[in-house]
């Protein structure tokens, strides 16, 4: 109930009748209290723009969405195994969509690359036999993963991969206005059918003279829908599908096991750039750090990755997050301690945000910094390994980041009451 009221309050305060005032006051509802609390709570760090104005366009557009304008704002997130279950991204997505409008689920990969790969507030799955590839744990020789670092392939006639809007009653995700799916065209590629709500819309021959990521977009009446890809013959490789509506917030939660900047720069750079350009993010967030073991290499690789991002998305805002603390592997019977390197990694990544003149949010500090992981593990916010975060921590992080985002928007609206109005 609290979440429903959160969105309703925003609608009343922010989306006033434009006929009465071409630029009515915009009140940003920054919650006074957190729903997710713990004895380990600390002050939530603010979002910092080290470029001074690098995030201006993003917050301007966010204010336009808040004012009820017919605008779709896209956010992309890259994370490691802690993001593969979509729980942190899902919490952020859900809270932002309840506040600003549901713009669609965003990207979800076809197939099940990990047993726990289940996105929030959307339904998806496969039937029949599929091979799932990803750039870190299950690589494929040709390196064709598209921009999300994952793919699924089947040569079994009748095998399906599908995605569907959330079940009725879900807080968000129950409607979609378009599906844009991606697949691999290549020599000796197979054929597949595209079904919308049980009706065959297309039969696609994926054979081509050279390997290439291709896209198919299907517009539908805004509402509940199901997209199914059905293998007819030959080998078919799929990447993913983006579910969108005409306005509101859409958030792509991309998580790959053991992801780090080095692995991302080892992807086919043309595929990565093309995919990012097509998704056209207004804000791209990079959250990795748990799987970075060479700070020196990190400092040489991260600039390469940021250059790729900026070339693919010249108008976007960018933000780095520090990674959370985690428990160092100890001998059996010893008291768990934090991995000392994570304190350095947080500091190093902050320096990179300063160097690149982009946005920064200190997740490491938001969870209590060095020494916090053993406490969170003991209180069961982390999984038993002390490395992977659990559902309560996913919700905890997501709520605090959204709080920081709303707080930053509120500060900007206080400074410029006409933020988001037509100039």
Predicted regions and their residues:
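Surface-exposed patches in mature extracellular/periplasmic domains of secreted proteins
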Residues: 99-111, 321, 363, 412-416
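Catalytic His-Asp segment of secreted/periplasmic serine-dependent ester chemistry enzymes
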Residues: 268-269, 325-423
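Bacterial N-terminal signal peptides that target proteins for export
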Residues: 1-6
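Conserved SGNH/GDSL esterase-like catalytic core that processes O-acyl groups on lipids
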Residues: 74, 82-304
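Cleaved targeting-peptide boundary
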Residues: 19-26
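Conserved, compact domain cores that house catalytic/ligand-binding motifs in diverse enzymes
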Residues: 55-56, 68-77, 84, 88, ...
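Hydrophobic h-region of N-terminal signal peptides that target proteins for export
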Residues: 9-18
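Membrane/wall-proximal cationic-aromatic binding patches
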Residues: 28-77, 133-136, 148, 157-159
């Amino acid at each position: 109930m609290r979440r429903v009221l959160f969105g309703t309050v925003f609608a009343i305060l922010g989306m006033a009748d434009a006929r009465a005032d071409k630029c009515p006051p915009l009140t940003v509802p920054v919650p006074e209290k957190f729903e997710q609390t713990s004895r380990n709570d600390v002050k939530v760090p603010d979002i910092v723009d080290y470029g001074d104005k690098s995030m201006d366009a993003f917050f301007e557009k966010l204010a336009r969405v808040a004012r009820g304008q017919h605008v779709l704002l896209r956010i992309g997130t890259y994370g490691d195994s802690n993001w593969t279950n979509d729980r942190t991204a899902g919490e952020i997505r859900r809270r932002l969509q309840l506040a600003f409008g549901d713009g669609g689920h965003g990207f979800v990969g076809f197939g099940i690359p990990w047993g726990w790969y289940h996105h929030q507030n959307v339904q998806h799955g496969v039937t029949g036999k599929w091979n799932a590839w990803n750039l870190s744990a299950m690589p494929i020789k040709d390196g064709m993963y598209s921009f999300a670092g994952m793919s699924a392939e089947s040569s079994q006639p009748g095998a399906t991969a599908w995605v569907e809007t959330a079940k009725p009653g879900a807080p968000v995700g129950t409607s979609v206005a378009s599906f844009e799916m991606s697949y691999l065209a290549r020599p000796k590629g197979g054929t597949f059918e595209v079904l919308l709500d049980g009706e065959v819309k297309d039969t696609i021959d994926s054979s081509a003279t050279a390997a290439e990521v291709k896209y198919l977009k299907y517009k539908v009446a805004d509402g509940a829908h199901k997209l199914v890809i059905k293998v007819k013959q030959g080998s078919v490789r799929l990447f993913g599908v983006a579910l969108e509506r005409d306005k509101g917030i859409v958030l792509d939660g991309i998580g790959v096991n053991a992801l780090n900047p080095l692995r991302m720069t080892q992807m086919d750079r043309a595929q990565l750039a093309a995919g990012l350009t097509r998704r056209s993010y207004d804000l791209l967030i990079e959250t990795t750090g748990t799987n970075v073991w060479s700070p020196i290499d990190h400092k040489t690789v991260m600039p390469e990755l940021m250059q790729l991002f900026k070339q693919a998305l010249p108008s976007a805002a960018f933000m780095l997050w520090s990674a959370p603390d985690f428990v160092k592997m100890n001998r059996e019977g010893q008291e768990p301690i934090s991995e000392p390197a994570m304190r350095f990694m947080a500091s190093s990544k902050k320096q990179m945000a300063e160097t690149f003149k982009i946005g920064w949010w200190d997740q490491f500090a938001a969870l209590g910094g060095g020494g916090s992981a053993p406490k969170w593990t003991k209180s069961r916010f982390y999984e038993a390994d002390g490395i992977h975060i659990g559902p309560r921590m996913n919700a905890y992080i997501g709520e605090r980041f959204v709080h920081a985002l709303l707080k930053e928007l509120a500060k900007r609206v206080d400074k410029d009451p006409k933020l988001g109005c037509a100039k």
